[in-house]
Swiss-Prot record:
Protein name: Nerve growth factor
Propeptide: 19-76
Keywords assigned: Cleavage on pair of basic residues, Disulfide bond, Glycoprotein, Growth factor, Secreted, Signal
Function: Nerve growth factor is important for the development and maintenance of the sympathetic and sensory nervous systems. It stimulates division and differentiation of sympathetic and embryonic sensory neurons.
Membership in a protein family: Belongs to the NGF-beta family.
Statement: the UniProt record of this protein carries the keyword tRNA processing: no
Localization in the cell: Secreted
Covalent S-S links between cysteines: C90-C155, C133-C183, C143-C185
GO molecular function: growth factor activity; nerve growth factor receptor binding
Predominant localisation class: secreted
UniProt organism field: Danio rerio (Zebrafish)
Amino acid sequence: MRWSMLVLLLLSCSQTFAQRPGDICPQNPHHGQDVTANTVPTVDPKLFNKRRYRSPRVLFSEHPPDSEPSRSRTKRKAGPPQHRGVYSVCESISHWEGNKTKATDITGNEVTVLPDVIINNSKKKQYFFETTCSSGRTGGSGCLGIDARHWNSYCTNSHTFVRALTSFKNLVAWRLIRINVACVCVLSRKSWRA
């Protein structure tokens, strides 16, 4: 008898989680209604107290941010730096992006990023802190400081996933979307056969 209750509980829990494609954004009392392009969803401010919805690369604000996101963790240093000059092999540009309309979510779907939301009765915009390769170094020119006689190299954007308010198939939800976070160097050894 106890095993059957446990199995029923397990089945009901797994069915509940299987039906959740994303964390549905609580809106007005008309929760299940279709979302049109003109509606701005209302978000409960208590949602931002949850750690899973906070990211230093995503910001909801009425005005564009002035500075880079604050770092929550600092690296420990044992002593003075051993190397005098530390240089990046790929030049990059970091900025707050406020006009993102489309993005790719973690399942590969192209979703619509909601530009505006209402939090505490004020309209706020979603901003994403992105780092991209400088246009001059992307592609065939190679990375800085790499020996071109022995190595093929190029700079490319690296990505991560952050939570954002999105719309997909008329359902507004928190989804993980891909944004650019770094410019990295890709190396391959040149063939010795010429």
